Each structure stands twice: as structure tokens, then as C-alpha cells.
């Protein structure tokens, strides 16, 4: 593939049909997709499982898979697209799970769609919203939109760069919190 040429997202991702039919995963393995935190364990993130009576039809999500959630969020009325960086698990049938094709980088895909404007512009023509604000789009149709991706080596470099930048931001945020606590403690001690 030539770099930076317009192609369908389906050139980079394929719909995963892996289901939990063997019961390999249970309710403790159910994952949710968060706009802020990505793909997370539902119980750890929300305090409980919202899974149905049976998780056998749920889709299996492996590390590196890309997931599209058909749930509207304030900044993303057509849903969000995230890559699983954590443990394997399962998602409700309301989610679409995609395998990353050879020559594609799942981390890059996530960062490509990290920009709300780009994500919304991509999904809007593909998604029909129902009367109850639910998403009317097949897993396959999500792959029919146009994207412009670089070559695989460039995708890898770009994805790694933004991952490192996110890690640096996280470290700086922790340092900021420590400094705020220190300031508060010193002010209390000074004026006690």
C-alpha cells in the first residue's frame, strides 16, 4: 500500500466474529469502552457488571483489537473507537470488535480517531440514529468510511510517539497532584 493514500478503513481492520460461545470468559471479564480511559474492565471501572444473564454471545476482545462502541457520548454522538491495551475480555453484542490487518497498527488507529472532530466526521455518514438515540450501523459498515493512513512503519512510529507523550503527560499530572498536596500541607502547617 502506498503511504498517505485515501482508503477504506476496511483495508486496515477486519470484523472479528470471535464469540464467547465456549464460556471461556465470565461476567468478571466484561469490558467497557470509556472516552477518557479507553477499554477497561467493567467491574473495576464502574463497580459492578452490567452484563446480561448470559455472556456466551459476547464478543471476545484480545489485546490489540479495536472496538467501536455504538453508544453516544456528549462529545461523540456517533460513538467512539478505541484499541485494547489491557487484558483479553468480552464485550456486549452492542459493541463491534475488529482485528487489525497485517500492515496496520492498532495503536495508530486509536490515535487517528482520538480527535473528536475527525471521529465524528468519519462516523456521521455511516451511522443512522434511531428514535431512541440508538445507533443503526452494522459492524461491516463502520469499515466503509475513508481514512488516510501512512505506511505501516510510519504508523508504528507515530503510535509509539503519542503513547510516550501520553505517558509523560500522566507522569506530569501525578507530579502536579503531589505538588498540590505539598502546598496544601505547608499552608495548613504554616497557618495552624
Regions found by a protein language model. Give the residues of each.
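Non-catalytic DNA-recognition/assembly elements of restriction-modification systems
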Residues: 1-20
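A short glycine-rich beta-alpha junction/loop motif
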Residues: 88-94, 129-153
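DNA target-recognition patches
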Residues: 10, 20-52
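Charged, low-complexity intrinsically disordered regulatory segments in eukaryotic signaling
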Residues: 112-132
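Amphipathic alpha-helical segments with low aromatic content
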Residues: 1-6, 145, 151-192
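A short beta-sheet element
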Residues: 53-117
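Short, solvent-exposed loop/turn positions at domain surfaces
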Residues: 3, 49-55, 131
Amino acid at each position: 500500500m502506498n503511504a498517505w493514500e485515501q482508503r477504506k478503513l476496511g483495508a486496515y481492520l477486519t470484523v472479528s466474529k470471535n464469540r464467547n460461545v465456549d464460556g471461556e470468559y465470565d461476567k468478571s471479564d466484561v469490558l467497557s469502552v470509556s472516552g477518557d480511559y479507553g477499554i477497561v474492565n467493567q467491574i473495576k471501572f464502574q463497580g459492578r457488571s452490567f452484563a446480561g444473564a448470559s455472556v456466551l454471545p459476547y464478543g471476545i476482545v484480545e489485546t490489540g483489537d479495536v472496538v467501536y462502541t455504538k453508544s453516544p457520548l456528549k462529545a461523540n454522538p456517533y460513538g467512539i473507537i478505541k484499541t485494547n491495551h489491557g487484558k483479553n475480555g468480552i464485550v456486549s453484542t452492542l459493541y463491534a470488535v475488529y482485528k487489525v490487518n497485517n500492515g496496520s497498527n492498532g495503536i495508530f488507529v486509536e490515535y487517528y480517531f482520538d480527535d473528536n472532530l475527525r471521529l465524528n466526521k468519519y462516523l456521521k455518514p455511516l451511522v443512522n440514529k434511531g428514535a431512541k438515540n440508538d445507533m443503526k450501523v452494522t459492524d461491516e459498515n463502520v469499515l466503509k468510511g475513508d481514512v488516510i493512513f501512512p505506511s505501516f512503519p510510519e504508523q508504528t512510529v507515530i503510535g509509539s510517539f503519542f503513547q510516550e507523550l501520553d505517558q509523560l503527560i500522566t507522569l506530569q499530572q501525578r507530579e502536579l497532584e503531589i505538588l498540590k498536596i505539598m502546598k496544601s500541607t505547608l499552608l495548613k502547617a504554616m497557618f495552624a
